C-alpha cells in the first residue's frame, strides 16, 4: 500500500477541518516522561482520550488491544525508532494514521503518514492531528 507522506503544514493546507468528535483515542509514544505528560495534557484539553506508552513494545501492546484513532510517536525511542514502530503498527492496522515527531527531520519516514517538528506551535500541532483523524474517517 502506498502512502503519500506530508509535512504537518501540507496536511492542514490540503484539508479543511471542522470539529472532531471528542471521543477519539490517540496513542502517544514518548520515552521522555515530561514531554509525554505535556502532549497528553494538550490533547486531553482538546477533548481527545489519550493512552500513553514509553517503549515500542508497550505501544504495540496498547495498539493491539485498544481502538486507537491515531498514533503520535517520537522518532527516537529507547530500543527502537518511530519509523520501525510505524512499520509494525501499519502491518496490524494500516488505516490508522501514524504521526512521527522529532526535533530533527528524519532521513526516512518509512510508513509514517506525517512528520511534525517538536518546534511546531500548539495550534498547528492540534490542527494537524484533527486533519489526519478527519481524513481517515475515524
Predicted regions and their residues:
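Acidic catalytic/metal-coordinating carboxylates
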Residues: 55, 81-84
